[in-house]
Amino acid sequence: MSLNYIKNFYEGCVKPPTVIGQFHTLFFGSVRMFFLGVLGFAVYGNEALHFSCDPDKREINLFCYNQFRPITPQVFWALQLVIVLLPGAIFHLYAACKSINQDCILQKPVYTVIYVLSVLLRISLEVFAFWLQIHLFGFQVKPIYLCDTESLGKKPNILKCMVPEHFEKTIFLIAMYTFTVITMVLCVAEVFEIIFRRSCFLFKR
């Protein structure tokens, strides 16, 4: 997905009412997607092909790889992006249908509450994704994976498997954790900005 396409799509939508929200949308839409789409494919694209066990047999490699990766990181992070973007996308779709502009979101309490709820839901989804990512992938990719082949009736029951490019994958994991933390911080900051700007609007009245 090109940056021009994202820019045109972004300009056609109702922009978030906060400066932090606009930066967050641009951050999400360009940097995170580019990082995942380009670098994620480069690091994880051929992982299954280069994952090898001892003995190096195709059926054993496939079995152990499926055990090592119940879900591939690319699929997980793509789902994370889509799910986390949903609350904001639904709100902006609703705002576009109702012809709600940026000022209305901050001036009318009902729109402010709905927008804040969408941001809080986004934070909750990011926290859940962060916990799930830790549970699935941990913080480090080790060069050796011990595969349990007892269900295959193979002996020995524990086989050693080589994980390709484990150091690059560890760096990428840390980067994705960092993206999630930055996103959560931006969302929290956006809530405070909304409260501050709403308070200023009420004070001026």
UniProtKB/Swiss-Prot annotation:
Disulfide bonds join 53-161, 64-147. Gene3D superfamilies: Gap junction channel protein cysteine-rich domain. GO terms for cellular component: connexin complex. Highly expressed in lens, where it is mainly found in lens fibers and to a lesser extent in lens epithelium. Weakly expressed in retina. Not detected in other tissues tested. GO terms for biological process: cell communication; cell morphogenesis; lens development in camera-type eye; organ growth. Residues 1-22, 96-111, 192-205 are cytoplasmic. Keywords: Cell membrane, Developmental protein, Disulfide bond, Membrane, Transmembrane, Transmembrane helix, Transport. Residues 44-74, 133-170 are extracellular. The chain crosses the membrane at residues 23-43, 75-95, 112-132, 171-191. It is a multi-pass membrane protein. Changing residue 32 to Q: In Aey12; dominant negative mutation. Viable and fertile with a small eye phenotype. The lens is absent and only the lens envelope remains. The retina is misfolded and poorly differentiated. Disruption phenotype: No visible phenotype. Eye morphology appears to be normal with no significant effects on lens transparency and refraction. Expression levels of the connexins Cx46 and Cx50 in lens tissue are slightly reduced. Belongs to the connexin family. Beta-type (group I) subfamily. A connexon is composed of a hexamer of connexins. Mediates calcium-independent ATP release, suggesting activity as a hemichannel. Does not form functional gap junctions. May play a non-essential role in eye lens development. This is Gap junction epsilon-1 protein. The lineage of its organism: Eukaryota, Metazoa, Chordata, Craniata, Vertebrata. The gene is Gje1.
